[in-house]
Amino acid sequence: MKKEIASHLLEIGAVFLQPNDPFTWSSGMKSPIYCDNRLTLSYPKVRQAIAAGLEELIKEHFPTVEVIAGTATAGIAHAAWVSDRMNLPMCYVRSKAKGHGKGNQIEGKAEKGQKVVVVEDLISTGGSAITCVEALREAGCEVLGIVSIFTYELEAGKEKLAAANVASYSLSDYSTLTQVAEEKGMIGQAEMKKLQEWRKNPADEAWITA
């Protein structure tokens, strides 16, 4: 599963690896990887594989789920496809409440006491997913956990999720994707070394000259 999803993401260009020409994230951090899972929406076979995989993760880890919640905006489409496959209610959660109308942060129904699983496209530092979890908890829901398409496996993200006391499972991850990229000849040994060094300590830019 992890290798299959990693291959899909690389093949459609949803994930770029540029260890010799780093990306700059909005936080200002230099990174050898950039992930745009929104591209998966344009590839029916890929998005179907993702929906099936997310359904499998949910059934395995959170079998008592009653509602599927997507993170706005990237998680919404995947949450919709998964909820349709599982014949479950769906909602989505904004990063903050609307400034007009009813001022909703949660769109759709997620009622007090209901068991909810959050669908996210990407786990980086875990911030957006945790915002979603907190909003659902404030509404009285029992959040069983998070499922996502991909995770960078950053320690900062793992620590935040642990602090929020929420379980998280991803279809694929950084370690698997870089391995698949090397197997496909997309990166060489020197580039792999840089990718591995970044993974150990993303804040330390020494990996750029590794």
Curated annotation (Swiss-Prot):
Pathway: Pyrimidine metabolism; UMP biosynthesis via de novo pathway; UMP from orotate: step 1/2. It comes from the Bacteria. GO terms for biological process: 'de novo' UMP biosynthetic process; pyrimidine nucleobase biosynthetic process. Orotate binds at S124. Keywords: Glycosyltransferase, Magnesium, Pyrimidine biosynthesis, Transferase. Belongs to the purine/pyrimidine phosphoribosyltransferase family. PyrE subfamily. Homodimer. This is Orotate phosphoribosyltransferase. It comes from Bacillus cytotoxicus (strain DSM 22905 / CIP 110041 / 391-98 / NVH 391-98).
